[in-house]
UniProtKB/Swiss-Prot annotation:
Binding site for ATP: K557
GO biological process, one term: valyl-tRNA aminoacylation
Name this protein carries in UniProt: Valine--tRNA ligase
Species lineage: Bacteria, Pseudomonadati, Pseudomonadota, Gammaproteobacteria, Vibrionales
Enzyme Commission number: 6.1.1.9
Enzyme class: ligase
Top-level taxonomic group: Bacteria
Subunit record text: Monomer.
Amino acid sequence: MEKTYNPQSIEQALYQRWEEAGYFKPHGDTSKDAYSIMIPPPNVTGSLHMGHAFQDTIMDTLIRAERMKGKNTLWQVGTDHAGIATQMVVERKIAAEEGKTKHDYGRDAFIDKIWEWKAESGGTITKQLRRLGASVDWDRERFTMDDGLSAATQEVFVRLFEEDLIYRGKRLVNWDPKLHTAISDLEVESKDKKGFMWHFRYPLADGVKTADGKDYIVVATTRPETMLGDTGVAVNPEDPRYKDLIGKQIKLPIVGRLIPIVGDEHADMDKGTGCVKITPAHDFNDYEVGKRHSLPMINILTFNADIRDAAEVFDTNGEANDAYNSELPAKYHGMERFAARKAIVAEFDELGLLEEVKDHDLTVPYGDRGGVAIEPMLTDQWYVRTAPLAAPAVKAVEDGQIQFVPKQYENMYFAWMRDVQDWCISRQLWWGHRIPAWYDNYGKVYVGRTEDEVREKNNLASVVVLRQDDDVLDTWFSSALWTFGTQGWPENTDALKTFHPSEVLVSGFDIIFFWVARMIMMTMHFVKDEEGNAQVPFKTVYMTGLIRDENGDKMSKSKGNVLDPIDMIDGIGLEELVEKRCGNMMQPKLAAKIEKQTRKAFEGGIEPYGTDALRFTLAAMASTGRDINWDMKRLEGYRNFCNKLWNASRYVLMNTEEHDCGMAEGAELEFSLADQWITSQFEVAAKEFNAHLDNYRLDMAANTLYEFIWNQFCDWYLELTKPVLWKGTEAQQRATRYTLITVLEKTLRLAHPILPYITESIWQSVKPLVDGVEGETIMTQALPQFNEDNFNADVVADLEWVKAFITSIRNLRAEYDIAPSKGLDVMIKVADEKDAARIQANEIVLTSLAKLDSIKVLAKNEETQACATSLVGKSELMIPMAGLIDKDAELARLDKEVAKTQGEIKRIEGKLNNQGFVAKAPEVVITKEREKLEGYQETLVKLEAQKETIAAL
């Protein structure tokens, strides 16, 4: 082994060897249990971020552990075509490089351009996955628009249409006026804005008056421009001010339209004026009110969100309607929506109908990619009827076929699924799965897998002109088929039979509705087992939290707090990091602030920590479902942990290579207490590690490894071996070498799922020294399981006593400022014969590690001079102090410590007795101060006791 641990020199070469040797593939032995995980397919446009690194570490740890248990494991990898994101990347590229738009290319040529781009640049994220050590089967890599998944997507659409579970309708959607497409709620980003609430007078028709004699009512709105499409005003049916007006009419200013006043609980008596204008074609809440009261829907906006020359009027079913005429005032024709807002407010003012304007805090929805305010828009779209699909998906979770970890996410799932809305699946894009529907010249729609199939099924002659729908399917539609579409469905392939359902889905809670729920619905509808029962896509849903920065803020480019996992693996210089965070910003004005923050937080850039340290940090912070505040200090700490394991392994190899390790049959072995103890402690660690993985507690599994490797194996056991290796008999040395190398080999196997590279690298040096170890890689060795035969509770108790003895001596040295190297004569009053036997059996170890000249066991009533004392279990350990220390100097030092401690106690008591401080300070601050006070009070008691002991010398 190299002298120093250098992850850069081992990681990439090892991964290449693993991949080329085919170790990531399922072993194919169908007599063994199968275990599969389907990776959430990252966007093909993307690059690895901390969320990916976190989830991929969890999945790889689980897959590696199950592979080591002998299971036939598949970690299915692939990428998502990411419709809107990919189309925008390529549109920006051709605009920047060629000054062209997609329309200059035309649909087919532009799609070819995207495929070209994917071939050149779409592999970034898969290259980065390799850097994380992800043991996915690359030969099975899939893409959501490859031939197989495209065929599966088409098949699902056609079958759902034939079952009347897909329909086309005119409904309200989130419309991006810049990108000209419907977008999902997940692609809508709400922004807080300062705005206004305008109060308009709406005149009552037919001479009607309000209860207080006015001939108008006042409506409050944040969107004056939409009043051109108003078809009603809602008041609360319980509101005494307006309930008599229900059924009466308003004469809408500017357009002169007569619209009804309706009673609806959507109108809040205590909010605004209590009267709400209803624009069903331009507001989601109004759309629902309109449906309840059969109000027509009037669309006043173009797809650019400009005012139309003539409105479109529809009934509540989206059919064209002549309830109102379609005229709009000529001066507003073609006017941009926000310009129209100003003009309409001005006209209300001129008409004397502007009652007042108030400042108002708004939450405005923006398209996260187009960057403009989205518009609720009435458009023709394709929808999935989700209620029939949701019922069995709810039951599967209720019955425990699918379990959520943590369990509380079930409630979020149920809340959404029990009130599920139909799903808009069409998008006005070119890149994606084109909807398999064709129209004739009369607008009649035909659905089929191909145009030929449509013609044959419907007896359409070749002279009948058919035009395919221009829209593509929502990316989430094809993603919903991921667990079974990747395994060859609709064919009943061996892969589908072997690896479906998958074991666990590791996902963020933010896509529980967009992806998790839809996968469950689609899979249960289309995939059946041999008995014809619906199959679930996975048995467990493991919900992770988000990775946030050290202050708990979400990582985002605009905040300049994004950390690239690859930079933590390879390191990055400060100037390069500043350029990475500040270059190509959507809001360049933030660059100076971000540069300042970056220079302060990363003065020397980021040093290379290696993949294993990053993985271990992510695992150790993975408490289920909770957000993680990233901490570079913990990353540094776990890199030190990797160093510790490396150096400990070097110590083991230096003491075992070219030595007799007792592997020969019949070799004489005399195991020390420490040998037996570390063997027992390993069994405890193996038991805990496996239990934590089974419960998806990777944080606790990582902590088990840390505690065993650092504290027990390195800090204690290796130290305890030194006296034996220096002074023991041949049989004792042989047994200790045997224990060193076998426990290290087992430890490497136990740690491998989280720390793949360092464990493989060390294991290759350890393997030749351990009898019976076969195979070329640690990846296919057995994951250690608890073996009761190797655990001895009495041994553990004895060694814990030895540790307590040594620790007590070390603590007394520190308390009384006695040099660690100074030999001491100690005495002990033993509580029972057991402790006396422990001293006798372990005298060499105790004197060696505690640096003692002698240990004297005192007779029952034997008197002693003044001593420093400490309890070891129930026995009393004593160090005679005469001549060990300068009495006067030590008392003077202790007096100073006492005075300092008393000062701190007085200061904190003053704070806590100050009513002003207690009233204003947060509870957490007060608790901290109380804890500090308790700590200082305990210290004072110890100092006074030390003074008493020394004064008596």
